[in-house]
Amino acid sequence: MLRCPLFGLLLLLCTAAALPAAQPCFPGAVGYGIETPGGRGGKVLTVTTLAGSGPGSLREALAAKGPRIVVFAVGGVIDLAEQALEIDEPFVTVAGQTAPAPGITLIRAGLRISAHDVVLRHLRVRPGDCGKPKKSGWSPDGLSTYTAQTPGAQGPHDIVIDHCSFTWAVDENLSASGVRHAGRAFTSHRVTFSNNIIAEGLAQSTHEKGEHSKGTLIHDNAREIAILGNLYACNTERNPVLKPDAAAVIANNLVYNPAKRAIHTYWNTREYEGKMQTMLPATLVIVGNTLWTGPNTPPEMPFVFIQNGKADVYLQDNLTLGPGGKPVAEVGGNPKILKECPFWPAGYTALPAKEAAEHVLNQAGARPWDRDAIDERIVAGVRARTGKMIDSQEQVGGYPKPEPTRHTLTVPADPQALDAWLESFIPKS
């Protein structure tokens, strides 16, 4: 029996088989794909420059072949100059916690992952509008997993994005994507987004469509997706959104001030023209989450909205709080409500929603022990219920400009000691 652990109790609500997890990619990892080794057992590559490319750069380390662990001898801002970082070589761990304060922030572009077996931790990604005119067509994601456009390429899989901060994207802040009509193997699968800040998607900005503040898109057919313990703040919608046949566990997240939709599903007839008979419903397991409405939230908005009833939804212990702490509707759109949990990540125990929100505010984002001014401001705005939608990073202080820092890393000679060494950079609370 697959067990759906909640509040420390083992609730026998599911029926699919589950095996005990292998060694996780880092201590405490939960979700799907966490058995990936990432770069474990490979070479250690040290980032020694904040340049956007060239020798010693993060771009060079990500492009290297073979298993690799990327660590940082420098801290500060990496200006990507409108050229996204590509991770198309598998088996990599990016350990942002190894950077000296203030850590690593990527600006003026984001990350794209088409590889498998990727672990990314403790980075900030803040693409922004690059000073371009509104509706000019600049539409970067913060981070997106996607399927490479090569013959037979399968979708990215076994990917863990943990304790990162994603803000100011013009398309989605953080997404799992792929090919729409090629089947499940050709889109993202076994992907976990955990303990991230996903906030302030730019609204009336440079996207050609105009308003486009989006949190997370889970693409058609993406399966075994875990969205756990994240802070979604001040994104118009997609907090997250699932497309047809996508399947995700959405647990212990705090969603603040969605301006149109919080959790929802979406599809349009143009994308499925001639293929409606093949369209399968999305499946959402929504447990222990909290909605806090804000200045931009419409009063009639439900926490979960299902377009045209095309979804199966399991709901448990979600808090939906409007002005003055009054509850708002949990679900709208007439989905099929499941009485039993259809799937659940092995070994994961959700917190009660009444505890999860505070946990998220304390622990989410890159380097929660060493938050930058942007993350501090976002979290403070959530706590005070004053955070609002923005159209440009210039409304909230602009791109960060910390002084570059440097330190010396002493990488253990014993490969067996590397995991403990990487964790030693994270203060234990």
Where are these regions (language model features)?
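Acidic Gly/Asp/Thr-rich repetitive segments characteristic of extracellular carbohydrate-active
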Residues: 26-70
